[in-house]
Amino acid sequence: MIEPFLGTWKLVSSENFENYVRELGVECEPRKVACLIKPSVSISFNGERMDIQAGSACRNTEISFKLGEEFEETTADNRKVKSLITFEGGSMIQIQRWLGKQTTIKRRIVDGRMVVECTMNNVVSTRTYERV
């Protein structure tokens, strides 16, 4: 179930991302920069822990976690969140919670691409990545 996600991915398309990061509460200038960045994402698994590294010219982030166990994360926009990542129906589901708020990041593989659907309240952004 995890294997299709493993590897390095590059962003090839992004829909409604500015509205999503606005809904997260990201201020105007960093929001504009975030929309211009085309990050790469590397996902690995060592049998016990999963690692997700996201990198761009502006910022690199890395999380290391056990599936199904909550962990603390500092996001690319510097939010301090509690995250929980699980697998459901072939999708990797990440829920981030902070200050009474919640966002869901759903990753799935569609036709060899990784499709990432980010939802905050009623705002949805879809970002598509191709394997490098």
From Swiss-Prot:
Residues that span the membrane, as ranges: none
GO cellular component: acrosomal vesicle; cytosol; nucleus
Keywords carried by this UniProt record: Cytoplasm, Lipid-binding, Phosphoprotein, Transport
Residues bearing the modification Phosphoserine: S13, S14, S40, S42, S44, S91
Keyword Signal: no
Tissue expression pattern: Testis.
Gene Ontology biological process terms from the UniProt entry: acrosome assembly; long-chain fatty acid transport
GO molecular function, one term: long-chain fatty acid binding
InterPro entries: Calycin, Fatty_acid-bd, ILBP, Lipocln_cytosolic_FA-bd_dom
Family designation: Belongs to the calycin superfamily. Fatty-acid binding protein (FABP) family.
The protein, known as: Fatty acid-binding protein 9
Species whose genome carries this gene: Rattus norvegicus
Gene designation: Fabp9
